[in-house]
Amino acid sequence: MNLNKILKLIPKTDLHCHLDGSLRPETILDIAYKENIPLPNKELANFQEEIKVIGKCTSLKEYLNKFNLPIQIMQKEEHIYRVTLELLEDALKQNIKYIEIRFAPFNHLKDGLTLDQVINTVLTAMNYGRTHLNIMSNLILCILRQEPVEKGIELVNTAKKYVGKGVVAVDLAGNESDFPPEIHEEAFTLARKYGLHRTVHAGETGLPENIIKSINILGAERIGHGTYAYKDKEIITCLKENRIPLEVCITSNVNTSAVTSYQEHPIKKYLDEDLIITVNTDNTTVSNTNLIEEFNYLIKYQSFRFDDIKKVIKNGIESSFASKEDINKLYEEYLSAINVIELTNPIL
C-alpha cells in the first residue's frame, strides 16, 4: 500500500479551515459571472493567480488580500450555502470525517443579509453534510481584530443563540501585528460565560507574547498557528502545562513568510517536546493545498514517521470541539483504520 493510500485510509480532522479561503476557483468564477462582479482575469488558469498563493507572500497582510474576491461573491444565501457544501464535499475526498469551519460573518452583510441569515445558511449546509454526506462538522465564528470591539461583542451575543446547534466556538483572526488580543477581552469573557469554546490566532507572525496573552486574557483553549512559540521557553512551558493544542498549518506559514521554508518550520520540534500538535489546512484554495498534501510535506520535509502521523491525527480528534459522542465515533473509526493499516503494513 502506497503512502497516499495510507493517508487517505485514515479518517482525519481539520480544526482550522477558513471557509472564505477554501472556495473552488471555478465556483468563484461562476458566481462572479452571475453577479456581474468584475474580474481581473476571466480565464480560469490566469484568474487563479488572484486567489491563490504559489510560493510566498512578503507578509500575512499580503496573503489576506487573496480573500477579497471570495468574500465579494459570498453575499447571498444561495452562494454561501453552495460554497459551504462544496467545502464539505472536498473535505470528504481527503477522508476528513470531522471539520471545524470558521469564518467572519460580518464580512457577508454587504448585500443586506443579517448575521442570523449568514450563520443559519452555513449551518443548514453543514447539517445537510452530516445527514447526507456522512461528514461531521461544527462552526467557529471569527471576530476580526481590526474591527471595533462592539462588533465582536455583537457577534458573541448572536453566537449564544446557536450554542448546541452547530456553533461551538469563537476565534480572533486578522492582522495580529497591529491589534493585540487584549483589545477583545470583553467578547471572549462573554463567550466563556455563554459556553462557547475559544481559539485564537496567535504567534503566527512573530509576536510570541500574543500566545500567552490569548491564554491568560482571552481564555484560549487552542491556539491557531502558534508558530513563534519557540522564541520563549515560558510559552512552551505554558502550552505544555495547560495542554493547549496548536492548530498548525504548515503551508500557510510558508506562504505568509512566517517561516522561511517547510524544513524550517518548528512543528516537529514542538511534537518532540510533547506539545499537542494538530495538522490543518487553513485555506485550501489560497494556500493551494489539501490535508493529504500537508501530511506529504511533513513526511518529505520534517521526517514525519507513521507514529508521528498517528499521533497528530489522534490529537486532532481529542482536541476538537466536537461532542463526546462524535469524538467517540471518530476515535473508533480512527482505531479501526489504524489496525487495518498496521496489519497489512507490518514494517510501518
From Swiss-Prot:
Site (Important for catalytic activity): 225
GO cellular component terms, A-Z: cytosol
Name of the top EC class for this enzyme: hydrolase
Cofactor field: Zn(2+)
Enzyme Commission designation: 3.5.4.4
Binding site for substrate: 18, 20, 174
Annotated binding of Zn(2+), by residue: 16, 18, 201, 282
CDD domains reported in the protein's UniProt record: ADA
Catalytic activity, as annotated: adenosine + H2O + H(+) = inosine + NH4(+); 2'-deoxyadenosine + H2O + H(+) = 2'-deoxyinosine + NH4(+)
Pfam families documented for this protein: A_deaminase
UniProt keyword list: Hydrolase, Metal-binding, Nucleotide metabolism, Zinc
Molecular function GO labels: 2'-deoxyadenosine deaminase activity; adenosine deaminase activity; zinc ion binding
Alphabetical GO biological process terms: adenosine catabolic process; hypoxanthine salvage; inosine biosynthetic process; nucleotide metabolic process; purine ribonucleoside monophosphate biosynthetic process
Cofactor note: Binds 1 zinc ion per subunit.
Entries under Gene3D superfamilies matching the protein: Metal-dependent hydrolases
Signal peptide (residue range): none
Family according to the record: Belongs to the metallo-dependent hydrolases superfamily. Adenosine and AMP deaminases family. Adenosine deaminase subfamily.
HAMAP family, sorted: A_deaminase (MF_00540)
Function recorded in the entry: Catalyzes the hydrolytic deamination of adenosine and 2-deoxyadenosine.
Protein name as annotated: Adenosine deaminase
Natural source organism: Clostridium kluyveri (strain ATCC 8527 / DSM 555 / NBRC 12016 / NCIMB 10680 / K1)
Taxonomic lineage of the native organism: Bacteria, Bacillati, Bacillota, Clostridia, Eubacteriales
